[in-house]
Amino acid sequence: MPTASLETTINGAFDARETITPATRGEVRDAVDQALGLLDKGEARVAERAADGKWQVNQWLKKAVLLSFRLNDMSVIPGGPGNAAWWDKVPSKFEGWDENRFRDAGFRAVPGAIVRRSAFIARNVVLMPSFVNLGAYVDESTMVDTWCTVGSCAQIGKRVHISGGAGIGGVLEPLQAGPVIIEDDCFIGARSEVAEGVIVRKGAVLSMGVFLGASTKIVDRTTGEIFMGEVPEYAVVVPGALPGKPLSNGQLGPSTACAVIVKRVDERTRSKTGINELLRD
């Protein structure tokens, strides 16, 4: 089915989603399955960067991901420790893969790495024991470290390092208009969280424990400029706090958490955050 027809069919089905069930067959199911297949192979993306640097969200692909939950029934998924199983609607991306399939894909997936079908993993990616949700896109030479989560439809660029325990939010619950986007050459520090459609621009560095949502104030301590929803290119960001406003009794109120841009990336920063090509051979 041509892309334009896919989009039309999926948009129409989403408007009538209450009528979609696991018993639904025909054009709608075929369109959703085809859309998820395009996402799985990296031939389509939920969000794409235009030449002007703006990100365009393909809402119809996000709708296809959501519709798949209406179309697919629960089933037993084998492979748990101790011969246990799981009970879910979304199969593993790696279901049925053999050695040749992994070699062709060209990335590493160590034991404990979970990737759901319709997520795309590019060549030379390293997946430590982590979780990549459906519809996500992880580009070349990125490291997804231990206990990281890459949320539904999140877009991760090339040569990104997502450190241990960091979380990249998804779009499905709570429902978000746009996915989290981490552009090329970014470093996300351990136990940090980026959610609610925040964009981290090229080359930015988040230190350990930075929490960013759509309403988080990101303060440039050099200029005083405040950003929200977007980290500028090559910014080095640390956790911070804004002074509290006076309370009704005149006392100083509680401070408010924020993020602080302390500098722009320099060679010293690069030496601490650069990727190790030996891990990607």
UniProtKB/Swiss-Prot annotation:
GO molecular function annotations of the record: 2,3,4,5-tetrahydropyridine-2,6-dicarboxylate N-succinyltransferase activity; nucleotidyltransferase activity
Record keyword Acyltransferase present: yes
GO biological process, one term: lysine biosynthetic process via diaminopimelate
Reactions catalysed according to its record: (S)-2,3,4,5-tetrahydrodipicolinate + succinyl-CoA + H2O = (S)-2-succinylamino-6-oxoheptanedioate + CoA
GO CC terms in record: cytoplasm
Short name of one Pfam family: Hexapep_2
Subunit structure: Homotrimer.
Protein name according to UniProt: 2,3,4,5-tetrahydropyridine-2,6-dicarboxylate N-succinyltransferase
Organism lineage string: Bacteria, Pseudomonadati, Pseudomonadota, Alphaproteobacteria, Hyphomicrobiales
Gene symbol of the encoding locus: dapD
